[in-house]
Each structure stands twice: as structure tokens, then as C-alpha cells.
Amino acid sequence: MSKSGSVVTCFRKGKTWLFEWLKVGFVPEVVTGWEWFLMRVFFSGLVIRHLFDADPFRYDSQPSPNGIAHLVDLSWMGEDWVHPTFKVLTIVCVVLFVIGRGCFVALPLLALMSTLAGTIENSQGAIKHSHNLITLVLITQGIVAVWPWVHRLRYREVWRLPEKLTMGSYYLYYTQAMVAGSYVIAALSKFLNSKGLWVWNSPYIALDLVKSQRQAYYRYLDDPSLVESAWAAVWVANHPWFSRMIFGGSFFLEAFALIALKNRPWAFWIGVSLIALHRGIFYLMHLHFGYSELILLIFLCNIPYWMWRLGRRIGGPEPHTPLT
């Protein structure tokens, strides 16, 4: 067989394998009540901390409108009554969310409050990304919560869940899709803004490393080493090919993050890898994405489930139909 024939054969086998691999998974899985309950509890803690933060509510103007601030004046967010009201509504909505009642009202309201708080904060002339993923998750879960009611109004019939699946199955699946999709969008924006040269140009990140370290120092003035040492930037600049391999790996991790939807093991390893990526960014650039890391830990890594699986493996034989 000629070389060209071998290449064609390998290509066809690879394409066949890929299509077969894509046929399995990528659908909502069975999620038990206790599993989804723990996720709700953990995520609710993040929502409370986010909406109890007073920073967004100290602004009474929007000098650089962002997002919906172009359409609506949000300067009222700085009035004295707003933050206490948001706190009360947050507690009420979070309680409803945790007990699994009234989510079709609680989740959209939480999503609205999170959107308003993030918008007024990002309308001050600088963009913050630390809370974005919380808002996206709330919007996604709000849509899932409202969907059965929309279906009932539109088709005049109750939306019935497929056998063995619960609403938790859909909440988790579409939350994972939103979280993973946000990283795909990040990779796509890098690709488009660099005209496809992001990986090749990645050694120039050395300049961003120095910039972010200086900004971190001048923000708090408590760590002189951030100014005195630039070893990471020097190493990146002096080792361009290694830099392309390292940063290119992170780029493709983001680009293919939606593989997390295939099944639980893939979700776990994609989640762990993205957390490691954030840890590396924090170590090199002092950019903290704590909320994003915790969301990955809750919805992709899903530690309670794997602890349960480990306990089953140690305590007895694996059941024929695992409780997933």
C-alpha cells in the first residue's frame, strides 16, 4: 500500500473512531437527590457571599456603562435601601433553592440581582471577571427551572422527564455546559483577536506577567518581591518554544472544555485541569478566580459523588446499575 493510501486509511479509521466516540455520552445522566442537594448547598454559599458583598452597592453613578447599563440607568443601586433588600431577597431565594421549592421564581430573581450587581460594578471604567461565572450559572439554572412552566403554557401539557432522570440531571448537565462553554468562548476570543496566532505569540505573555505583578504590588504595597523579581517573565521570554507548549496546552484545554459533557470521568478531569490552570495563572500573574475554581469543583469535579463511588468500591462490589 502506498503512503498516500495508508494516510487515507488512517484518516478514515480516525474519523470512524471519533464519530463512534461522540455517539456515546453527551446527554444528561442520572443524578440522585442527595447529590444535587449537596451541589445546591455548596453553590448557595457562593451566591450568598457574592450578593452580600457591599462593593457593587457603593456606586451611585455609571460613568462607563457596560452591558444592560446602556439601556437602563442603574445609579439607584447605590441607594441605602438596595443592599439590605438584596440581602433579604438573597436569603429567601437561596432557602427556596436549597429545599427545591419555587426555583422557577428564586433562580431567575437571583440571576437578575447578580446581573445588576455585576453590571453596576463593571460600569465604573474597569471590568472585573471574578463574579461572571456565578451569574452565568444562575441564568442557566433559571432557564432550566422555568422551562417546564414554559412548556406547560405553550403546549398545554405537563413536561414529563425521561425515565430515571430528574430535574437535577438537567440542572447539572446544562450548568456544566455553560461552565465549559465559557472557557470555549474564551479560547475562541483569543483565537479571533490574535487572528489565529495566539499560541505562536504566547511568549509575549512575558510582558503581561510583569504588568500583572506590578499591578498586584501597587494595589496593596505589601510584597516587594513582585517588583524586584520577574523570573517567570524572563524564563518565558528566554524559552519561547517551551512557552508555546505550555500556554498552547492551556489554550487547547479551554477550546475543548465541552468534552466535560461526555460523562462524569471526563467532567472530573476537565474540571481538575481547569482548576490547575487557574492556580497557575494566580501563581504567575496574581489574578484570582476563586469563584470560578469553586464552581468547577462543585459542578465538574463533584467530589461527593466520587467519594461515594470510592466508598462503594472499598465497602463492597460495584452494583450492576450504579447510583449516579
Annotated model-derived regions:
Residues 2-324:
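Alpha-helical membrane-anchoring segments
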